[in-house]
């Protein structure tokens, strides 16, 4: 597997574009991904019960068959809690995209992100779709068009050889606040020119989302609009992938690399964040327990503020373990921060405070927890909680 300098349109047969339609003051705010041939597709959605209109429209597109040729996305407006008119507007976005690209209606997915409750300005949406280019657009413009409070574009591309053919996979995501997925707002789109059955793609997506996107948190809020969509158009012309083969294992490894990179990028770009926090839990009896405990630690406001302040307060970590709901032995926990052991058998060790303080000034903080009761592990990612987070969200609508 090779990391390449690419974009969401790097896999064969894919194109992307983005434009400024006026939903936001300056940045691009509408874009699409287009495949020149129908692509096998898979998707997962927010677990928030107040799902936005685009979620329902995309689910409808998947009803007839698991194939897509395009994804239309707008930012600046979530089209959530907008009633029947919001649903009609999302359907209109799908219809206009299908008409312009000359593809079937049910081969278009729709995604939106932004302020909840405002009606879509359909005059701007319509004009924006008309501006988008089918095959001569700029993929970087799409990557900008999906952003809201994000401070940087989140993109990654890999290549590997499968069945004697070069296969490419690219991913792009947005997310900075309202991130606590349970597949926030989190949108992620993955393209690949690999040939893989839709059913196997859906199964793999669910596994990787549980290991990556569902293990990140910024502020504990789960969005109405979370969506991850994968398109595999087969243009690499590799033999159709089959589960249990060496080629499928290579593809799955590449998929893991893409989703993990995007997930960590979202966590690192949390609103007002200055540090990425990574929590690794080992020695659990079940993977689910390890993941649960890791996510509870990284979700703790007290752990997050301690990371912001450079305070190695292990009491906040042990407290989060205690209410996590995961299984552990209270008297047999080891905690390390940056490889420095600060707790052994649930008792504080003698450690180098100066070295710990210096480590906590770094931008990537790794907390290791060993439960010593099993062989399973899990990882979660988040960010610190700063003054800037409050400032951004206190003034979000203005």
Curated annotation (Swiss-Prot):
Family matches, as Pfam families: ArgJ (PF01960)
One Gene Ontology CC term in the entry: cytoplasm
EC nos: 2.3.1.35, 2.3.1.1
Which reactions is this enzyme annotated as catalysing?
N(2)-acetyl-L-ornithine + L-glutamate = N-acetyl-L-glutamate + L-ornithine; L-glutamate + acetyl-CoA = N-acetyl-L-glutamate + CoA + H(+)
Cell inner membrane as UniProt keyword:
no
One GO MF term on file is: L-glutamate N-acetyltransferase activity
> Site positions for Involved in the stabilization of negative charge on the oxyanion by the formation of the oxyanion hole, renumbered to this chain?
113-114
Q: Which InterPro entries is this protein grouped with? A: Arg_biosynth_ArgJ, ArgJ-like_dom_sf, ArgJ_beta_C
- Which positions does UniProt annotate for substrate binding? 148, 174, 185, 271, 393, 398
Hey, which pathway is this one from? Amino-acid biosynthesis; L-arginine biosynthesis; L-ornithine and N-acetyl-L-glutamate from L-glutamate and N(2)-acetyl-L-ornithine (cyclic): step 1/1; Amino-acid biosynthesis; L-arginine biosynthesis; N(2)-acetyl-L-ornithine from L-glutamate: step 1/4
Site (Cleavage) at 184-185
What parts of the sequence cross the membrane?
none
UniProt function note: Catalyzes two activities which are involved in the cyclic version of arginine biosynthesis: the synthesis of N-acetylglutamate from glutamate and acetyl-CoA as the acetyl donor, and of ornithine by transacetylation between N(2)-acetylornithine and glutamate.
Family from the record: Belongs to the ArgJ family.
The annotated subunit structure for this chain is: Heterotetramer of two alpha and two beta chains.
| Protein name per the record | Arginine biosynthesis bifunctional protein ArgJ
